[in-house]
């Protein structure tokens, strides 16, 4: 065993013990005080690893052999768990503990909150089959696993990207993070495509081929199901074998559309859409609210935990019906609409026009008339005085920014709105800690913090934080 970090370099083999999980899901080990991130490592494992990357302050390694298994280990349900649900080999209770430690570490290390703690952790009741949206990719370049026999056909794949590789796709027949009906659709689609030579997967390198993506959206509370077949050009007749077979063998399908993406960009939405069957949307419910979800609209990916998250926001907001609420980065307006019945007026601010259109539509569907949506680039909107004078100042502000957090001008200006409460919802504890430190410097103090496990078996973390003066 190497005991001095000076000998750690690319290609070196080490015997080390994984101590904890780092933010992002890699195992964390140390040689002396030098940090080694271990791909797919879990706390308590003793492993032989190969260093594949060395930087000034850390190294990354992959496991060659598990020398001693962790007492916290459990058997993964998905064969390919390491793609995007890499924590499946760690017991669920331990996953929550590790995620909580990561949030605490971020607030202590980045925010300087030495006494920071999480007040509550909301675990997930549905630990599998919870994703209401999946995007699978067709490819003529299949990733061949070491465990597969020689001579396996690599000219067709329907599955997911290998982490860090965008040129090859791992063929997947079962993915337990999505509803079971999704796995049935995957199998049928693969079988039909292999039998029909015209249904060739698209190759972004050569710009040749037809099938690009298979997107599935599930209304888990409404039993509705959308299939979106994304193609490289418009040819419904060529799609007929796939369309006919899916509609015949999967009667649960309530919506089928074809997005056409003629661009080289490898994205699962197109310049236009063909409606094939049913409506161009499905419906979903969170609490008493109903939402229409089109192929390309944003919606919380876990309906079950989405309600848990919104209930936490509503609970810590503690509204009495007289408050003016601002929902910043409101997206399609789901939080704003969820709070509306307990507030006097709610104002949602969002820069993306299509999201605002969905928000307006959802307010009409739910017959809510005390929510108002404004197009606003929040990097500059308030600081440059663009807020209309007719809009009253807020009592409560809800902030739910993208992973990058708030723009410095926004986080630095927020206190000037003089709200009594700020509720910060975040999927990134590192940027949240940075922003909360700025709010703290402007007299907003942390009063409550709750972690909601939105995506079990993944490294993703969601937190809801109450700050007040």
What are these regions (language model features)?
Residues 64-75, 82-200:
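Extended interfacial segments that mediate partner engagement and assembly in macromolecular machines
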Residues 167-210, 233-257:
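Internal alpha/beta scaffold segment
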Residues 128-132, 223, 459-460:
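A short, glycine/Asx- and small/polar-enriched loop/turn
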Residues 3-17, 23, 234-469:
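Rossmann-like S-adenosyl-L-methionine
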Residues 27-32, 158-162, 228-230:
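Short, acidic/hydrophobic/Gly-rich beta-strand patch recurrent on exposed beta strands
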Residues 1-80, 372-373:
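Terminal RNA-binding accessory module
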Residues 217-219:
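Structural signature of eukaryotic scaffold interfaces centered on beta-propeller domains
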């Amino acid at each position: 065993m190497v005991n001095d970090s000076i000998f750690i370099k690319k290609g070196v083999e080490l015997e080390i013990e994984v101590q904890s999980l780092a933010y992002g899901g890699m195992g964390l080990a140390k040689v002396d005080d030098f940090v080694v991130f271990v791909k797919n490592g879990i706390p308590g494992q003793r492993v032989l690893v190969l260093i594949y990357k060395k930087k000034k302050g850390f190294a990354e390694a992959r496991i060659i052999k598990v020398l001693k298994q962790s007492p916290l280990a459990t058997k993964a349900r998905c064969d390919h768990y390491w793609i995007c649900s890499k924590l499946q080999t760690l017991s669920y209770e331990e996953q929550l503990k590790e995620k909580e430690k990561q949030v605490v570490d971020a607030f202590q290390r980045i925010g300087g909150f030495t006494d920071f703690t999480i007040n509550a952790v909301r675990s997930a009741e549905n630990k599998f089959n919870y994703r209401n949206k999946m995007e699978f990719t067709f490819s003529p370049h299949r990733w061949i696993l070491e465990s597969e026999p020689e001579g396996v056909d690599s000219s067709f794949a329907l599955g997911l990207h290998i982490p860090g590789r965008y040129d090859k796709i791992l063929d997947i027949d079962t993915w337990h993070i999505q509803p079971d009906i999704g796995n049935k659709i995957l199998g049928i689609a693969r079988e039909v495509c292999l039998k029909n030579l015209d249904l060739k997967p698209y190759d972004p390198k050569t710009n040749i081929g037809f099938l690009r993506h298979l997107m599935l959206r599930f209304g888990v509370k409404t039993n509705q199901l959308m299939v979106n077949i994304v193609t490289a050009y418009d040819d419904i007749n060529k799609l007929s074998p796939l369309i006919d077979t899916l509609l015949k063998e999967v009667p649960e399908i309530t919506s089928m559309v074809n997005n056409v993406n003629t661009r080289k960009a490898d994205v699962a939405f197109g310049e236009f859409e063909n409606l094939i069957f049913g409506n161009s949307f499905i419906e979903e419910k969170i609490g008493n609210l109903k939402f229409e979800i089109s192929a390309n609209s944003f919606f919380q990916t876990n309906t079950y935990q989405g309600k848990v998250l919104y209930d936490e926001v509503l609970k810590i907001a503690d509204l009495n019906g007289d408050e003016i609420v601002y929902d910043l980065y409101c997206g399609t307006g789901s939080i704003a609409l969820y709070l509306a019945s307990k507030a006097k007026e709610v104002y949602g601010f969002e820069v993306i026009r299509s999201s605002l259109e969905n928000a307006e539509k959802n307010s009409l569907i739910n017959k809510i008339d005390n929510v108002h949506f404004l197009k606003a680039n929040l990097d500059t909107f308030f600081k440059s005085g663009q807020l209309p004078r007719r809009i009253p100042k807020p009592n409560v502000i809800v902030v739910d920014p993208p992973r990058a957090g708030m723009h410095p001008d926004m986080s630095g200006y927020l206190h000037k709105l003089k709200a009594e409460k700020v509720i910060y919802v975040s999927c990134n504890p590192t940027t949240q800690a940075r922003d909360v430190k700025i709010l703290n410097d402007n007299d907003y103090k942390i009063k409550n913090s709750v972690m909601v496990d939105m995506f079990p078996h993944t490294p993703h973390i969601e937190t809801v934080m109450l700050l007040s003066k």
